[in-house]
């Protein structure tokens, strides 16, 4: 696999980063590699007998092979469904890069590929002191951009790609995720995205509200 680890970000919140990340995990596994997901910081967690768990992080865990320990996959599990900075403050947690570095190293030792899913859109901060760019830079990861295909997506995608580049980081690919079945001229929009984003398209995930991640993996085009 050309990229043994990468960071999945999005053009906004709720545009399908987890859908894309789980599809990526299954696509990597279909090539015969072991692959695990990571959700460094997750808010909106629910209480379980095993502790606070997040729906997206659980989806990443289910798509992983081998399946990592939840606390390693999601080191910061925050109860409130808020921006991480606010959710962490609510429970008196101070986010630090060190636990994330340690967890990532453990996951790298467990599998050939690690898919790290970010929070919200690229510019969403992790804390008052940390941006996602700080984490990505520390872990030395390239970035894959998930574009939620809806009205305004070309602007959002170009701004996000420019922000990633301005942070001195490398965006190695983008994925079109169709999230609005009523969108007009969707083919033209995806064509325009391809013309304006200076990185290869890693796939186009169609609108399938009840599809399983393993089935969506067929729509991912991993680089050789």
Curated annotation (Swiss-Prot):
Give yes or no: UniProt keyword Iron-sulfur. Answer: no
CC per GO annotation: cytosol
Q: Which residues bind Mg(2+)?
A: 18, 56, 117
This entry's Enzyme Commission designation comes to 6.3.3.3
Disulfide feature: none
Catalytic activity reads:
(7R,8S)-7,8-diammoniononanoate + CO2 + ATP = (4R,5S)-dethiobiotin + ADP + phosphate + 3 H(+)
Query: Where do the coiled-coil regions begin and end?
Result: none
Return the HAMAP family for the record: BioD
Identify this protein by name: ATP-dependent dethiobiotin synthetase BioD
Q: Which organism is it from?
A: Xanthomonas campestris pv. campestris (strain B100)
What would be the name of the gene that encodes this protein?
bioD
């Amino acid at each position: 696999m050309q990229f043994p680890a990468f960071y999945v970000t999005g053009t906004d919140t709720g545009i399908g980063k987890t859908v894309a990340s789980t599809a990526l995990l299954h696509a990597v596994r279909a090539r015969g590699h072991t692959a695990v997901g990571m959700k460094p910081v997750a808010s909106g967690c629910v209480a379980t007998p095993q502790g606070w768990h997040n729906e997206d992080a659980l989806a990443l865990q289910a798509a992983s092979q081998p399946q990592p320990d939840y606390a390693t996959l999601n080191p910061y599990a925050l109860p409130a469904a808020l921006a991480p900075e606010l959710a962490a403050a609510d429970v008196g947690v101070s986010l630090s890069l060190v636990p994330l570095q340690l967890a990532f190293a453990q996951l790298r030792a467990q599998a050939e590929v690690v898919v790290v899913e970010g929070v919200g859109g690229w510019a969403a901060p992790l804390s008052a002191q940390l941006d996602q760019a700080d984490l990505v830079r520390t872990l030395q990861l390239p970035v894959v951009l998930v574009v939620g295909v809806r009205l305004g997506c070309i602007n959002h995608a170009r701004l996000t790609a420019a922000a990633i580049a301005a942070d001195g980081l490398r965006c190695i690919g983008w994925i079109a995720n169709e999230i609005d079945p009523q969108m007009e001229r969707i083919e033209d929009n995806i064509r325009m995205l391809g013309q304006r984003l200076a990185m290869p398209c890693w796939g186009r995930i169609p609108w399938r509200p009840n599809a399983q991640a393993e089935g969506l993996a067929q729509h991912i085009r991993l680089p050789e």
